[in-house]
Regions:
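Catalytic cores of the polymerase beta-like nucleotidyltransferase superfamily
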Residues: 1-194
Length: 194
């Protein structure tokens, strides 16, 4: 079961704020410029983000510019891994999934695969390398060949990530365990050396 849920919409932040005001729902403007609004309902927080298209990532962490979109496919295309690029149509009563990158199949096969070119995805945000490793250890999944190759040849991208973020991800990797193979031990060893 998910730790949290990400809600995405074609409504702009201004439209979401207006709907919240009309419905007397408390709002926390967490990331308006990135399209994210947090709604507080019955002591629960729900983050809702406008569909987005990203531009270049010149700092290796965040997009230079975020462009809002009205198309869920644009939003899913910017996700890191296929297993995180699945949407459930909340307006449908039939559990209708939007899964353009076969993330459900990758979950069934226990595979971690990037959306699109793995080198490009990791270059956009070096933290994705650590997230991939964390998912591997947490879920007991394996990497597809291209993702694994991109991880092993792009450790230098971690140089752009703060030590605090690296430490946080690394501790989560250790907590989740699943050191089941020589490859797992090699990944941990490589991380420690980096």
């Amino acid at each position: 079961t998910p730790h949290d849920y990400d809600f995405a919409t074609n409504a702009t932040p201004d439209q979401m704020l207006k709907m919240a005001e009309e419905s007397n729902i408390e709002v926390i403007p967490t990331g308006i410029k990135y399209g994210t609004v947090t709604f507080r309902i019955d002591d629960q927080s729900f983050e809702v983000t406008t569909y987005r298209k990203d531009s270049n990532y010149s700092d290796g962490r965040r997009p230079d510019q975020v462009t809002f979109s009205t198309n869920i496919l644009d939003d899913l295309s910017r996700r890191d891994f296929t297993i995180n690029a699945i949407a459930l149509n909340m307006l449908s009563n039939a559990n209708e999934y939007v899964d353009p990158f076969n993330g459900i199949k990758d979950i069934e096969n226990k595979v971690i695969r990037t959306v699109g070119d793995p080198v490009e995805r990791f270059t956009e945000d070096g933290l994705r390398i650590l997230r991939a490793i964390r998912f591997r250890f947490k879920l007991g999944f394996t990497f597809d060949a291209a993702t694994y190759k991109a991880i092993m040849s792009n450790w230098q991208l971690l140089e752009h990530i703060s030590q605090e973020r690296i430490t946080s991800e690394f501790l989560q990797i250790l907590i989740y365990g699943h050191l089941d193979s020589a490859e797992d031990c090699y990944l941990i060893d490589a991380l420690i050396k980096k």
